[in-house]
């Protein structure tokens, strides 16, 4: 199964609490084994349970792709060591890089797959270039989606497709498609929520959406992320 509905302690905002890549899922601590098993089955990657800066909102703080995970500079040493140790135990050769910036909500401010990264205009040009180097992408741009600077919360992109805020223009969709090298659609989740990045955990193998997501929304999400046809 490549798509499932789930809640985290009755919250439908799964993307707030985790960061999925094609190699690993960083996830908040304290979820039951049944939910972890659903995530493993759908996303098909190992799970590393952790906090970041003693907080459960791992998806807001962490961004990443198959090459690297970027975390705030202020991550606790024990948390960073836990993530690195777990990656090593799983046999995953992947960088985890604390990023020195006044900004900490990196997951909300960075949208990336393995080809490219779109970062918020809140970052300087120098910071954007540094993020691109860490993520090992071919291209990095500063920009907005549908007039929102929090590009990571209003979008989801994988190596197979992407979904963004329904107010994104046709010109933005074309630009994003060229940047990321995949088709980009508009849509919502959790009964009309436009901040799709906060509503789901997705990679190239599957997607787990908030439990309030409707049938028509699921069809659009499947299409956008390359799971139809």
From Swiss-Prot:
Output a single Gene Ontology CC term carried by this record.
Answer: cytosol
Q: Which UniProt keywords apply?
A: Initiation factor, Protein biosynthesis
Lineage at the top is: Archaea, Methanobacteriati, Methanobacteriota, Thermococci, Thermococcales
**Record carries keyword Transmembrane helix:** no
Report what the protein is called: Translation initiation factor 6
- NCBIfam families in the record, alphabetically? eIF-6 (TIGR00323), PRK04046.1-5 (NF003129)
Gene assigned in the entry = eif6
Q: Which InterPro entries match?
A: eIF6
Name a biological process GO annotation.
maturation of 5.8S rRNA
- SUPFAM superfamilies cross-referenced by the UniProt entry: Pentein (SSF55909)
**Family indicated by similarity:** Belongs to the eIF-6 family.
- Which GO terms label this protein's molecular function in UniProt? ribosome binding; translation initiation factor activity
Q: What does this protein do?
A: Binds to the 50S ribosomal subunit and prevents its association with the 30S ribosomal subunit to form the 70S initiation complex.
What Pfam families does the record point to?
Answer: eIF-6 (PF01912)
């Amino acid at each position: 199964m490549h798509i499932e509905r789930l809640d985290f302690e009755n919250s439908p905002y799964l993307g707030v609490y985790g960061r999925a890549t094609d190699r690993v899922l960083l996830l908040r601590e304290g979820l039951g084994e049944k939910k972890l098993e659903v995530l493993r089955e759908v996303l098909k990657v190992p799970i590393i349970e952790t906090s970041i800066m003693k907080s459960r909102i791992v998806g807001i703080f962490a961004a990443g792709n198959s090459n690297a995970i970027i975390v705030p500079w202020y991550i606790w040493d024990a948390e960073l060591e836990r993530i690195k140790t777990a990656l090593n135990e799983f046999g995953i050769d992947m960088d985890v890089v604390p990023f020195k910036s006044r900004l900490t909500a990196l997951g909300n401010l960075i949208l990336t797959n393995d080809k490219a990264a779109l970062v918020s205009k809140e970052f300087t040009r120098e910071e954007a270039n540094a993020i691109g180097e860490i993520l090992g992408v071919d291209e990095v741009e500063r920009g907005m989606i549908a007039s929102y600077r929090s590009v990571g919360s209003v979008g989801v992109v994988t190596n197979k497709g992407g979904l963004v805020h329904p107010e994104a223009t046709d010109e933005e969709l074309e630009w994003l498609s060229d940047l990321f090298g995949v088709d980009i659609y508009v849509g919502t989740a959790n009964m009309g929520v436009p901040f799709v990045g906060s509503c789901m955990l997705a990679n190239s193998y599957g997607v787990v959406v908030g439990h309030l997501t409707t049938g028509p929304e699921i069809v659009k999400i499947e299409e956008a992320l390359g799971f139809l046809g």
